[in-house]
Structure formats: structure tokens, C-alpha cells
Design a protein with these regions (language model features):
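Well-ordered, non-membrane alpha-helical segments in soluble/globular domains
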Residues: 56-58, 117-133, 167-182, 218-222
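Substrate-gating cap/lid alpha-helix
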Residues: 154-195
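Surface-exposed cleft-lining segments at the edges of enzyme active sites
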Residues: 43-47, 81, 98-129, 159-171, ...
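Basic, amphipathic N-terminal segments that precede the first structured/catalytic domain
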Residues: 1-71, 206, 228-242, 249-254
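Acidic carboxylate-rich catalytic motifs and surrounding loops in phosphoryl-/glycosyl-chemistry enzymes
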Residues: 146-150, 189-207, 240
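Short catalytic/ligand-binding loop motif for oxyanion handling, primarily in non-cytosolic enzymes
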Residues: 1-5, 80-85, 152-158, 201-206
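A structural motif corresponding to the C-terminal end of an alpha-helix
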Residues: 126-145, 179-194
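A basic- and aromatic-enriched beta-loop-alpha substructure that forms the phosphate/nucleotide-
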Residues: 38-113
Length: 262
């Protein structure tokens, strides 16, 4: 969801995408990887196949030390997906792309762990602590930004999102999102959150990817760009900011054109 922010820049070189990780739950990141399912090769899109493979291999954690960046932006919209969990503690995200490959998600003794369940929460919190400690060890925790967004309840013309998303589903998802944001806020300062008026989190009826509770009106993306630009300028003024390394639901790893090293 955060990736769409960059499409609304007037100056496309101001915020530059270094890397992008999607369809990967933080709950999956904190667990052991499953064996790569042969069905993954059925995913025709190279981008979508790579996205699924990165989740299964936990590439994000392995890549963290190898990228130079100014900001690491995460959002929790992809936490809406269920998980596939094997008895040995191996986990992956049951994204739509993985399920479309023919992966059943209930084979080899594994089972589905539903979003919003307490088991999901336990795995998610464990994953968050692993990500948090990794960023601390690399000295880049201050580069982390959390895009604190919620599912919208209405479209810009007053419509709802049924039959795909009911009001009850939206309310429940937002309650769980709020629980996750509250947990993260225990570990990082409020200045590292991007926060928005709820009116901006209204569903666009002309969004590139269609109508959805998390495909917002243009005003949201403009507000996000303003906050990201301000955060990037602040990070560049910080002592030693040009020397830090590392990357990043869906984490976005961004650099700023003002940083000559990037």
C-alpha cells in the first residue's frame, strides 16, 4: 500500500525507492522458513513469484545489512493475510499470490493461522521483536517509519466496500491494526509514526488498483509525501546519517536525492 505513495510525487527523484518487500507478514519474518513449495513456480508474474519467494525465505532480515537508505517505511496492511504454520514452527504468509499458485496451505501437517487470532498475535509480536532487535543491532532503528493507516469505511462518493469487505470486517481489522500500532509504540517514539486524519483514509473510486478500503484518495498520498519528505530531511541532518546501512507486510526502503552517497 505504501508503494503507491511514490507514484504521487511531482519530483520523481526526491524520494527514490531502493527496495520493496510486499505480501510478507511480520509474523512470518520471525519464524523459520518452510521448504519452498513447487507450486510457487506456477506464479506467472516474475514480480509476484519473487515477492512470494522472498517471504518464504525471509529475505528481508537477510538483506537488512546490505542496503544504504535514509528511511525504512513499513505499513501493516498486509497483516490482513492468514498464515501457513507447520508444527516445527515454520511459517509463511498465505498471500493471494501464493494461494493462486495451487498451494493448499493445509498439507504436510501444516495448518492455517487466521489473522486476528491469538496465535497470529503471538507470532506477530515475536516477529516484531526480531525486526526491532535487528534494526537496533545495525544502528538504524531511528530510520524506521511506521505508516499508521487504517481501513477506510467509505468511498469518496459515500459507498461501502461490500460484497468484498463488510463493515464488520473493516471494524475488526482496524481494531487489530490499532493493537499492533500500540505494541510498536512501546518500542519506538511517536515521531517515527506517520499519522493521518481519518478523512484522508477514504476509498478512491478511481484508484489504479481498484476500489478497496486501503486504496485511498489522492489527498492521503500527498499528505504522506509531505511527511516522508520532512522525515528524510531530518534524517539527513542527523549526525552520521549518510553512513548508515540497511533495508526494508510491506517495507519500503527510500533514499533522498540530497544524499550524495545514494
Amino acid at each position: 500500500m505504501s508503494r503507491d505513495i511514490l507514484n504521487h510525487q511531482q519530483d520523481k527523484t526526491q524520494l527514490v525507492l531502493v527496495d520493496y518487500y510486499a505480501r510478507c507478514s511480520i509474523a512470518s519474518l520471525g519464524a523459520r522458513p518452510i521448504e519452498m513449495p513447487p507450486a510457487v513456480q506456477n506464479i506467472r508474474s516474475k514480480f509476484q513469484r519473487r515477492m512470494v519467494e522472498r517471504d518464504i525465505r525471509k529475505d528481508f532480515l537477510n538483506d537488512l545489512a546490505g542496503l544504504q537508505f535514509d528511511l525504512l517505511l513499513i505499513d501493516l496492511i498486509d497483516e490482513r493475510f492468514n498464515l501457513y504454520v507447520e508444527p516445527q514452527g515454520k511459517v509463511c504468509t498465505l498471500s493471494g499470490e501464493l494461494l493462486s499458485s495451487g498451494f493448499r496451505g493445509n498439507s504436510d501437517g501444516g495448518s492455517r493461522c487466521c489473522f486476528e487470532s491469538e496465535e497470529f498475535w503471538r507470532l506477530w509480536e515475536a516477529g516484531w521483536l526480531i525486526v526491532l532487535n535487528k534494526l537496533r543491532c545495525l544502528g538504524v532503528l531511528d530510520r524506521l517509519l511506521v505508516n499508521q493507516v487504517f481501513w477506510g469505511s467509505r468511498t469518496e462518493n459515500g459507498g461501502n466496500f461490500e460484497p468484498h469487505y463488510s463493515s464488520r470486517q473493516i471494524d475488526s481489522a482496524n481494531q487489530f491494526l490499532d493493537r499492533m500500532y500500540q505494541r510498536i509504540s512501546a518500542d519506538i517514539p511517536s515521531g517515527q509514526f506517520l499519522r493521518f486524519d481519518h478523512g484522508l483514509m477514504t476509498g478512491s473510486i478511481t484508484h489504479t488498483w481498484g476500489i478497496s478500503p486501503f486504496h485511498y484518495v489522492d489527498a492521503y498520498y500527498q499528505a504522506a509525501i509531505e511527511q516522508l519528505t520532512a522525515s528524510s530531511a531530518s534524517s539527513l541532518r542527523a549526525p552520521g546519517s549518510s553512513e548508515s546501512q540497511s533495508p526494508g507486510g510491506a517495507p519500503l526502503v527510500l533514499s533522498d536525492k540530497q544524499d550524495e552517497k545514494l
